[in-house]
Amino acid sequence: AYPFASQNDKDFNNLLDVYLDAVFFSRLHELDFAQEGHRIEFSEEGNVDSPLEYKGVVFNEMKGAMSSAVSQLWQGISSYLFPTTTYHYNSGGDPAAITDLSYEQLLSFYKTHYHPSNAIFMTFGALDISELHNKLETQALSRFERQHKQWRVEPEKRYTAPMAVEQAYGLDSEDLSAATHHVMGWLLGESTDLDAQLEAHLMSQVLLDNSASPLRRALEQSDLGSSPSPLCGLEDSNREMSFMCGIEGSEPEHAAAVEQLILDTLESVVRDGVDQAMIDASLHQLELHQREIGGDHYPYGLQLIFNSLPAATHYGDPAALLNLDPALERLRETAGSGTFMQDTVQRLLLNNRHRVRYTLKPDDGINEE
């Protein structure tokens, strides 16, 4: 997405001109590809006897981005939660794969995908829509032949049984203790289904919101690691949502014990339930967050656009994701049934076979390789 906003008409139109030109008519010179993508240079400038190495702005940025354990943790478990769809891949580019990209492949990808037939235009504010549409038509749409292929992200093929994976990350330290991450992830329903999205958000909030929440409390009080994983929570930006929880500061051999701790905690929620006051408080917080204007540090218009964009991207109804009142009323009724958490945890998590236990352990030799 390429968002911009301005309260000044002239500034807005100037930005629109620049964005339309940059997105649909990029020059993409080969020298720019070498600078921004990848190239081979001597490691010491001017020293022809120094070793050759890969360089490039994006290449170096992604090396930096993927140097953190949390980034590798997120990419690692995502690749197993989404084994066959586009979410399997690192959207910024895997540094190890960037050097295989050719200039011709980049041009082909750009011409195929950065095309008005694939574009979604969303606007908010007191705009002259006819004037705006005419600008889009004359400066972009009319200058291309329509493509008839629709690009879709298909639903992920579901596992028939849970899986466990262990991988390693580089850590430059002689002491590798208390540096392992264990995370469990589940693939849930469609993010374009507002009822399913709100239900999953409420379940996640009740389980993980604070130290009194059952799953967060179990992870915080466990001696299997130092603290809950930063990945704990619900991810709803992909076509299908995912729920994750886990622990950091652990040891590789604790993987099965962490998994059992999480499953036992979820089973206790199903068996014993959760205080209705906790559910009501979480629902109230969820409702406030959903209705909050500017609560995500964006202008209100961009906030609405980002909320509805997943439905537009996946050929759903963008307006439906903004019609909160009926969905919140349905959730309020369901959440007050007395068995909301039991039913939801059982259905979305315990009965869900598309589950991954992912362990990321330190290795002091990887960085040298």
What does each model-found stretch correspond to?
Residues 1-158, 175-183, 188-194, 199, ...:
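Charge-rich, well-structured scaffold segments of protease-associated domains
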Residues 164-170:
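Aromatic/basic-lined ligand-recognition segments
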